[in-house]
Amino acid sequence: MSYNDTWQPKTRLGGLVQDGEVEDMSEALDTGLPLKEPEIVDQLLPGLDDEVLDINMVQRMTDSGRRVKFRCVVAIGNRDGYVGYAEGRDDQVGGAIQKAIEVAKLNIIDVSRGCGSWECGCGRPHTVALKSTGKAGSVDVELMPAPRGLGLAGGETVQHVLELAGIDDVWTRSSGKTRTTVNFAKATFNALRETSEARVPQHAREEREVIE
C-alpha cells in the first residue's frame, strides 16, 4: 500500500495506519480507536466517490451586517460497503463542499450487506442484511432487504446514499418531511449505521451471506 510521506499522524490510530500495522478500513474501525484524521480514510480507502446532495445559502444578521454562508450536504462511499455523510459550512460553495467531504470521511461506516430477503437466495451481498431504521429531525427511514433485481425502491436522495454504500436492491419506507434533503439523507445514513452496529447472529451471517 502506498502511503502519504507528508502526513504526520496525530492520533494513535493514524500512527498504526502509517506504520502498516492496520492495513484495511474494517480493521481500523474494529480497533475501537476514534477516527479523527481524514488521511486515515485516504490511505485505507483511496478513490472514494462523493455526491453533493444539497446546497443551501444561509443568511444571518450580525453587528456588521448580513452574513451569507453556504451549507452543503455530502455523501461519500466506495460503492462496496463503506459510506459516510456530513454537512459543511463555508463562505464559499467549494469550501463548504470540501469541509463536508473531510468530515464525512470521519463518519465512515462499514455497512452490513448480504442476501437478506426471503424472496431471494442468490447469496450475493446486494441488499441490507437486516431491516434497519434511521431518524433525523422529523424524518424516519426504514430499509428492508429486497430480492436481487428489484433495484432501489426509494426517493432520489435515498438512492444516492445507498448507491455509494454498495446497496443494489432495497425496500424503503419513509415518513415526515422527506422534502428536507438534509434530514432525509441523514436518516438514510443513520439506518445504514444501524446495520453496521447491529449484532448479527452467526446463523444469520451464514444463511444470508452477510458481509460486515
UniProtKB/Swiss-Prot annotation:
Write one Gene Ontology MF term: rRNA binding
User: Keywords for this entry?
Assistant: Ribonucleoprotein, Ribosomal protein, RNA-binding, rRNA-binding
Residue span, S5 DRBM domain: 48-111
Gene3D superfamilies in alphabetical order: 3.30.160.20, 3.30.230.10
Q: Which InterPro entries match?
A: Ribosomal_Su5_D2-typ_SF (IPR020568), Ribosomal_uS5 (IPR000851), Ribosomal_uS5_arc (IPR047866), Ribosomal_uS5_C (IPR005324), Ribosomal_uS5_euk/arc (IPR005711), Ribosomal_uS5_N (IPR013810), Ribosomal_uS5_N_CS (IPR018192), Ribsml_uS5_D2-typ_fold_subgr (IPR014721)
Q: Return any one Pfam family short name.
A: Ribosomal_S5_C
Identify the GO cellular component terms for this protein. cytosolic small ribosomal subunit
**One GO term (biological process):** translation
Q: How does it assemble?
A: Part of the 30S ribosomal subunit. Contacts protein S4.
Q: Record's domain comment?
A: The N-terminal domain interacts with the head of the 30S subunit; the C-terminal domain interacts with the body and contacts protein S4. The interaction surface between S4 and S5 is involved in control of translational fidelity.
Family the UniProt entry places it in: Belongs to the universal ribosomal protein uS5 family.
Q: What HAMAP family does this protein map onto? A: Ribosomal_uS5_A
Reported function = With S4 and S12 plays an important role in translational accuracy.
Protein name as annotated: Small ribosomal subunit protein uS5
